[in-house]
C-alpha cells in the first residue's frame, strides 16, 4: 500500500524563490481528477518547481532532494559544529583565487591584504594548521589534462574532448545528456587534487575549501571524491560565518600568520598562492596550447573571439600557417546548448546548401572561429566562467552592474602573480573521476537536474 503525501511533504515543492527553467519531462495520461500525491505516481504533467536553496546551483537548474540533503551538510553552520569538536583532527583550508578576489573586492582590500587577513582569521582564530591556495592542485590538473590530450592527438583520434572541472556541467551531462560523457576528460579539478595533496601531507585533517560555486559542494560529495574535501563554503557563506561570529576580518591583519608556517612540508608557498596564464576559470584551454607550443618550436599562438563574449578559440600555427592544435573556451548554458547540438545532432544537408548559396564566390580562408571544433574545450556552466560563480559576492546586482563586476574581477585576476606550469618531471598518481551517465528516476520525490 503506497503512502499518501501532500505537496508540503515533498521538499522539492517549496515557496517561490528561483523557478526552475522547465520540467524534466511531460507525461500525458488520462485526467484522473483531484487526488493526493502517491509515492511512485507522477502527476499528469511534470510541474515547474522551485529550489529551496538561497541561491541556485551555479546555473545547474533544479536539484534533487538527495542533493539538497548533501548541500545541507556543507553549510557554514555544519562547519562551525565540526570545527568546535575537531580535536584530534587539524583544520586545513584551501582557497580558490576567484574566492580571494571576490572577498577582497567585498571588503575593499587588495588581494595581498586579503591574504594577510585570511591567514590571521584562519590561522589565529580558527587555529588552522594549513592554509593554502589551489594553484598546486591546478598545476597537477593541467599537467595531467595536457598529457592526456597529447597522447590522444598522437594516436590520431578526432573530435573534441571536454574539460570536466566544472561540476555544474558534469552534473548536466551525466543526468540529462549522457551522450556527452564519452567526450569528457576525467581529470579531476584543482579542488579535489588539492584535497588529496593535503590529506597526503596529513591524513588526520578536516579540509575546508572556499570555492566560487555552490556546485563544488556536490563535487566534494561524489563517491569518487571521498575524503578529499570535508566541507565547501562559498565567499557568501564565509561572510555569513564571520557575521555570525561577529568577527571583523580587517582586524586580523595584525594577527597575520606567515604563509610559510601555514604551508605543508615540501610545498612551495609561492606556487600555492600564484596563478598561471589563461582564463580566470583555470586557463585549461590556453595552457594546452602553451604545452603544444613547447613541443613545436617556432609555432605561434593566435587567439580569436567567437560569436559572443563567452566563446574564445586559441590556435597553434606552424610557420607555414598549418593548424597544429586548437582549444576553445565555452561558457554559459546557451553556448553549451549549441555544443550539445553540434556533438550529438548530425548537421543537415540543407544547412550546408544554404551556406553555399550565400557565399558562392567566397575565396579560400582559414576555418571560421568555432571552439566546438577544437581539440579541447574548456566548458564552464556559468556565463563568464568561474569569475562569475554563483557563490561569489555578486548578489543583488543588475545585469550591467554584474558585467562591470566581472570585468573588475577579471582585471584583478590578470594582476595575480603568475608562474609557468612546468612539464612534469616525475611520475604522478592519476587523479580521475568515474564519469558515467546517471539513470533517470521515476521517484516522485526526485526532480532530475534540468537547465
From Swiss-Prot:
Entry keyword annotation includes 4Fe-4S: yes
Tagged with keyword Metal-binding: yes
Keywords associated with the record: 4Fe-4S, Iron, Iron-sulfur, Metal-binding
Residue sites binding [4Fe-4S] cluster 1 per the record: 20, 56, 59, 62
Disulfide bond annotation, renumbered to this chain: none
GO molecular function: 4 iron, 4 sulfur cluster binding; iron-sulfur cluster binding; metal ion binding
Matching InterPro entries: Cytosolic_Fe-S_CAF, Fe_hydrogenase, Fe_hydrogenase_lsu_C
GO biological process: iron-sulfur cluster assembly
Record field: transmembrane: none
The protein's role, per its UniProt record: Component of the cytosolic Fe/S protein assembly machinery. Required for maturation of extramitochondrial Fe/S proteins. May play a role in the transfer of pre-assembled Fe/S clusters to target apoproteins.
PANTHER family found in the cross-reference section: NITRATE, FORMATE, IRON DEHYDROGENASE
Annotated family: Belongs to the NARF family.
Name used for this protein in its record: Cytosolic Fe-S cluster assembly factor NAR1
Gene encoding the protein: NAR1
Amino acid at each position: 500500500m503506497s503512502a499518501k503525501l501532500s505537496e508540503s511533504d515533498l521538499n522539492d515543492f517549496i515557496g517561490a524563490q528561483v523557478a526552475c527553467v522547465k520540467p524534466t519531462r511531460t507525461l500525458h495520461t488520462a485526467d484522473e481528477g483531484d487526488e493526493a500525491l502517491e509515492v511512485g505516481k507522477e502527476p499528469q504533467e511534470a510541474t515547474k518547481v522551485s529550489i529551496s536553496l538561497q541561491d541556485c546551483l551555479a546555473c545547474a537548474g533544479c536539484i534533487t532532494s538527495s542533493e539538497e540533503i548533501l548541500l545541507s551538510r556543507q553549510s557554514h553552520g555544519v562547519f562551525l559544529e565540526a570545527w568546535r569538536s575537531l580535536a584530534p583532527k587539524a583544520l586545513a583550508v584551501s582557497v580558490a583565487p576567484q574566492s580571494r578576489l571576490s572577498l577582497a573586492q567585498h571588503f575593499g582590500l587588495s588581494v595581498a591584504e586579503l591574504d594577510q587577513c585570511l591567514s590571521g582569521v584562519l590561522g589565529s582564530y580558527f587555529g588552522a594548521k594549513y592554509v593554502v591556495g589551489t594553484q598546486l592542485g591546478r598545476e597537477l590538473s593541467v599537467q595531467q589534462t595536457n598529457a592526456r590530450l597529447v597522447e590522444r592527438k598522437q594516436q590520431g583520434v578526432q573530435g573534441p574532448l571536454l574539460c570536466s572541472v566544472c561540476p555544474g556541467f558534469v552534473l548536466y551531462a551525466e543526468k540529462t545528456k549522457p551522450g556527452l560523457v564519452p567526450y569528457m576528460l576525467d581529470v579531476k579539478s584543482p579542488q579535489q587534487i588539492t584535497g588529496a595533496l593535503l590529506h597526503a601531507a596529513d591524513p588526520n585533517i578536516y579540509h575546508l575549501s572556499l570555492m566560487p560555486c555552490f556546485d563544488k559542494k556536490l563535487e566534494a560529495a561524489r563517491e569518487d571524491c571521498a575524503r578529499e574535501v570535508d566541507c565547501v563554503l562559498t565567499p557568501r557563506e564565509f561572510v555569513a560565518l564571520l557575521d555570525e561570529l561577529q568577527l571583523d576580518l580587517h582586524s586580523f591583519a595584525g594577527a597575520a600568520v606567515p604563509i610559510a608556517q601555514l604551508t605543508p612540508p615540501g610545498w612551495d608557498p609561492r606556487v600555492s598562492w600564484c596563478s598561471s596564464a589563461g582564463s580566470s576559470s583555470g586557463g585549461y584551454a590556453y595552457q594546452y596550447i602553451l604545452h603544444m607550443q613547447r613541443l613545436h618550436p617556432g609555432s605561434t599562438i593566435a587567439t580569436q573571439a567567437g560569436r559572443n563574449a563567452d566563446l574564445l578559440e586559441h590556435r597553434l600555427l606552424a610557420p607555414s600557417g598549418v593548424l597544429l592544435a586548437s582549444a576553445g573556451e565555452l561558457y554559459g548554458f546557451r553556448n553549451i546548448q549549441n555544443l550539445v547540438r553540434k556533438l550529438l545532432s548530425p548537421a543537415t544537408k540543407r544547412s550546408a546548401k544554404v551556406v553555399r548559396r550565400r557565399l558562392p564566390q567566397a575565396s579560400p580562408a582559414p576555418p571560421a572561429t568555432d571552439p566546438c571544433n577544437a581539440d579541447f574545450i574548456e566548458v564552464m556552466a556559468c556565463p563568464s566562467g568561474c569569475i562569475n560563480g554563483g557563490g561569489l559576492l555578486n548578489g543583488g546586482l543588475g545585469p550591467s552592474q554584474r558585467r562591470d563586476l566581472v570585468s573588475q574581477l577579471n582585471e584583478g585576476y590578470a594582476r595575480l602573480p603568475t608562474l609557468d606550469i612546468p612539464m612534469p618531471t616525475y611520475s604522478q598518481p592519476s587523479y580521475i573521476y568515474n564519469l558515467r551517465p546517471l539513470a533517470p528516476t521515476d521517484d516522485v520525490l526526485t526532480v532530475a537536474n534540468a537547465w
